[in-house]
Amino acid sequence: DRWNKKLLLKKKLLKVIENNFIKYGFDPLETPSFEIAENIGSFLAEDESNPMSDVFSFKDGTKDITLRYDLSSPLARFVAQNNQDLPPIFKRYAIQNVFRNEKAGNARYREFTQADCDIVGNVNPAQANAELCNLIASTLLECSLKTDQFIINVSNRKIIQGLIKDLKIPDSKQTKVMRAIDKLDKPGFGLRGVEDLL
């Protein structure tokens, strides 16, 4: 639960974030809390035999329904369904709660608010990354952080996939390795936790 000063601070920070999204030309998108499981693909689940284990899901008649795990999967579904109506470069932001079916712990929540923005379409990746870095930096500065109080990391999944391929990791283990790498900087994991996953 959040109330009083903590909730007011959260609302104030989210307003700063949203104002910066708008200032940088991003349009708002709101998606349902529930998605049809087959529309959102698989997640980075610990249990490879049950790739949807990290999401809250249930059956609605004959369909598997899940609570929104992140904001990227609903964006992918939205773009696929509305591609004909979208501009060549689609800049969208979303600020909504997401849900994780995992053990709650220090800095790990089953429900939390995610603020997300993406640039989709015919765009130069370097330009898009530069714009997003500028947006992040200006937002953090407006939230009263100083430049020596934050670091912006840019990662590219294709680079990691290329390294995995160069290391000749078998196809059957590549997904597990990607999942482990994804956990590297998460609280409570670190190098030892990643080694245990592998």
Regions found by a protein language model. Name each.
Residues 1-198:
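Extended, charged alpha-beta segments that form solvent-exposed binding/catalytic grooves
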